[in-house]
A protein has these predicted regions:
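Transmembrane helical cores of multi-pass secondary ion antiporters/exchangers
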Residues: 1-391, 404
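Cytosolic regulatory regions of ion transport systems
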Residues: 312, 319-330, 340-542
């Protein structure tokens, strides 16, 4: 057990370090995860025997749940809405057309058996959301014509259709399904997936908005459980769990819930971990010695997908929807194959009997080619097609983006002889660019106007324009340790011998805004505004 945990910890740490290096050199990190798995595998250096496809399928299915959920949860609907119709058609009709064209190519050109051809096409018909998200984020790749949102939503929502096609073809190959049953399967997949997705999302939204979690972070644990529930419930009765999970993700991600930004970051990290797991397992399951045999076939399918099938489908769908040629070209190139294709390939290997071709290793090579070639060249192709928008912020398409405001909020307590006490706001002489935004009076929050009277004990929040200095304001901290000569002295005494302004005092958990008569106490931390770096300990007291 300890050895297994050590190995798992080592793999995760190595993957995290590889991720940092990958971002610097521009090589997709998923290739490194696969390579690491191959090094650990039967043909690798460590030669760990692992051929349990059933176990791998179960683990990868769980991992894909969170990848699907994050595909919805991280998407900002306000940005995606203008291209939602295009994305949905691409993720349904586009997936089916891609599967069909690829299947026909495998059957007529590569001479695969018919249903095995269609199975291959179905398995690799969806694009990878996590890879697209990663490239857009890491490269801060702003794209014209709302293309980033189109790619994010398409890649985030097309796995359910690919899964459904794979399940149908596997049932046909097993001789377990009739024409009527196929129609019902399609109906059940979509209907139950949609119904459960919306119902679970609405229920979870109500809980998150009205239930107070007693422990910080339990809201993220609750959402994690909801993601699993969204997959399990429809799947138990023949529905599409991945579709349900995606719908729950996109509804919750675009609802007004507390701590949403931190939850997006949590699921971003979790999705990264799940990607590590899937691609490491792919490398672990693979036999590098088997790759040369299937590589020509995989290369032929990859080139057909990249240069023929994907462009035909993309232009066929987006041209009637009035998309520009350059946008269609970039969308065509950005159809990366990834985690879902791997999971469905493992599923096909486990379920299908008497396959004539090694679908698992073929998909392995296709994913490698897609990520290494297409993924690496997306930023370059965006420039070639004239689709880079340097004035747009791609991070706005994600739900953890917070608009930057050139304003700062300041809290003031009105007490004692404060000049604002018992005066109305309109009676005060204040700068035009200072705005009263909130008054806290006991347990009451008041949105003020000119007639509002400020009372003793009020906490007043005002806003003012933010200062954008470039290094001309510097701060340093001066700790008043035991025996310090300034203990018991006043701020006015300190000011007489120092050109530095004490802007605040950290006193335990309290922040004190100092005045001249304010006493300096032991363990205080004085925060000083210093015109230039000085040795504060050299300040002498007369």
């Amino acid at each position: 057990m300890s050895i297994a945990l050590l190995a798992a910890a080592a793999v995760i740490i190595i993957c995290v370090l590889i991720n940092r290096v990958s971002n610097k050199i521009g090589v997709p990190v998923l290739i490194a995860f696969i390579g690491l798995g191959m090094l650990f595998g039967s043909d690798g250096i460590l030669k760990i025997p692992f051929e349990n496809y059933d176990f791998a399928e179960q683990i990868c299915t769980i991992a894909l749940i969170f990848i699907m959920f994050y595909g919805g949860f991280g998407t900002r609907w306000s940005e995606a809405k203008p291209v939602a119709a295009k994305s949905i058609v691409m993720s349904t009709v586009g997936v089916a057309a891609t599967a069909g064209l690829t299947g026909l190519f495998c059957h007529f050109i590569l001479k695969f058996p018919l249903w095995e051809s269609m199975l291959t096409g179905s398995v690799i018909s969806s694009t990878d959301a996590a890879s697209v998200f990663s490239i857009l984020r890491s490269k801060k790749l702003g794209l014209k014509e709302n293309t980033a949102s189109l790619l994010e939503m398409e890649s985030g929502s097309n796995d359910p259709c690919s899964y459904m096609l794979t399940a149908i073809i596997l049932s046909i190959m097993g001789g377990k399904i009739s024409g009527g049953a196929i129609v019902y399967l399609i109906f059940a997949q979509f209907a139950y997936g949609l119904i459960f997705g919306f119902v679970i999302a609405i229920g979870a939204k109500l809980v998150l908005q009205h239930f107070k979690f007693s422990t910080e972070g339990f809201d993220a644990a609750f959402v994690l459980a909801v993601a699993v529930l969204a997959y399990a419930l429809p799947s138990a009765i023949g529905g599409n769990g991945y579709l349900s999970t995606y719908i729950v993700g996109i509804i919750l991600g675009n609802s007004d819930i507390k701590n949403k930004k931190s939850m997006v970051h949590f699921f971003d990290g979790l999705t990264g971990l799940m990607q590590m797991l899937i691609f490491f397992l792919l490398g672990l399951l693979s036999f590098p010695s088997a790759l040369p045999k299937v590589f020509p076939t995989a290369l032929a399918i990859s080139l057909f997908l990249m240069l023929i099938a994907r462009p035909i489908v993309t232009f066929g769908i987006l041209t009637p929807m009035k998309c520009s040629i350059r946008q269609s070209l970039l969308v065509s190139w950005s159809g990366l194959r990834g985690a879902a294709s791997i999971v469905f390939a493992i599923m096909a290997t486990v379920t299908a009997e008497n396959l004539k071709n090694d679908i698992f290793h073929i998909v392995f090579c296709i994913v490698l080619i897609s990520i290494s070639l297409q993924g690496t060249l997306i930023p370059f192709m965006a420039k070639v097609f004239g689709m880079v928008d340097n004035n747009s912020n791609v991070l706005k398409t994600f739900n953890d983006y917070v608009e930057e405001l050139d304003v700062q909020f300041i809290k003031l307590t009105v007490q004692g002889e404060h000049p604002w006490k018992d005066k109305r706001i309109r009676e005060l002489s204040i700068p035009w660019d200072l705005l009263f935004v909130l008054i806290i009076r006991g347990d009451q929050s008041i949105i003020p106007n000119g007639k509002t009277k400020i009372k003793d004990g009020d906490i007043v929040v005002v806003s003012a324009p933010e200062y954008h200095g470039t290094g001309d304001i510097q701060f340093t901290e001066y700790k008043i340790s035991s025996g310090n000569k300034w203990i018991g002295q006043k701020i006015s005494d300190f000011a007489k011998v120092s050109s530095n302004l004490v802007i605040l005092i950290k006193r335990g958990q309290e922040v004190v805004i100092p005045r001249g008569p304010t006493d300096i106490e032991e363990n205080d931390v004085l925060v000083l505004h210093v015109p230039e770096k000085i040795d504060i300990t050299k300040i002498k007291k007369d």
